[in-house]
């Protein structure tokens, strides 16, 4: 399969900061036949696709709620541009349901204004499929080492761009 013939999936992501400057990290549920199959580094930020005619910021808030139950947030910043990653060649045709070469993502830094009891991942609200099986607050600079290798450059860029909000 030639990756050049496949599009990037339009997505958003959220770096959720608590009042102490730590970021929310979720451990992806183990799934077969996805880009996370048999990956030891499954920790990531909430992210997901942009629906047709949906504004990216609205998509980010929706994805955050669907995956974590969190809605008590304030906007800190939006990434300067779109960040992309490519799936490894062996995952083409498998990861991202086989329809995309990778993702083109707009990222948002948000401040969590609620209580931790608001965070619900097992199960998430409104009957959504669980994306994560664990979560914790960590330092932003730790995240590039906790994510799957092919997403590391995106997380390194986020760690640099959103550093002013971090502990």
Task: For every predicted segment, state its role.
Residues 140-167:
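Charged phosphate-binding loop/patch that engages nucleotide di/tri-phosphates or the phosphate backbone
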Residues 1-45:
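N-terminal strand-loop-strand
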Residues 31, 87-91, 159, 166-167:
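Short amphipathic alpha-helical patches
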Residues 30-31, 39-40, 90, 123, ...:
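Short, glycine/charged-enriched secondary-structure capping and boundary segments
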Residues 19, 113, 160:
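Residue-level marker of positions within ordered structural domains that often coincide
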Residues 8, 56, 151, 155:
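Hydrophobic (often cysteine-bearing) scaffold residues that line and stabilize catalytic clefts
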Residues 48-149:
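Unchanged
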């Amino acid at each position: 399969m030639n990756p050049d013939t496949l599009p990037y999936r339009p997505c958003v992501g959220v770096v959720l900061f608590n009042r102490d400057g730590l970021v929310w990290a979720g451990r992806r549920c183990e799934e077969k036949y996805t880009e996370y199959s048999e990956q030891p580094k499954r920790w990531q930020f909430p992210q997901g696709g942009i629906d047709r005619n949906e504004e990216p910021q609205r998509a980010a808030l929706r994805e955050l709620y669907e995956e974590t139950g969190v809605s008590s947030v304030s906007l800190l910043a939006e990434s300067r541009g779109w960040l992309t990653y490519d799936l490894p060649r062996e995952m083409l045709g498998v990861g991202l349901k086989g329809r995309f070469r990778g993702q083109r993502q707009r990222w948002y830094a948000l401040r969590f204004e609620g209580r931790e009891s608001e965070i619900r991942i097992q199960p998430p609200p409104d009957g959504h499929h669980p994306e994560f099986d664990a979560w914790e607050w960590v330092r932003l600079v730790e995240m590039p080492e906790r994510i799957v290798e092919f997403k590391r450059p995106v997380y390194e860029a986020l760690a640099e761009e959103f550093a002013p909000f971090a502990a």
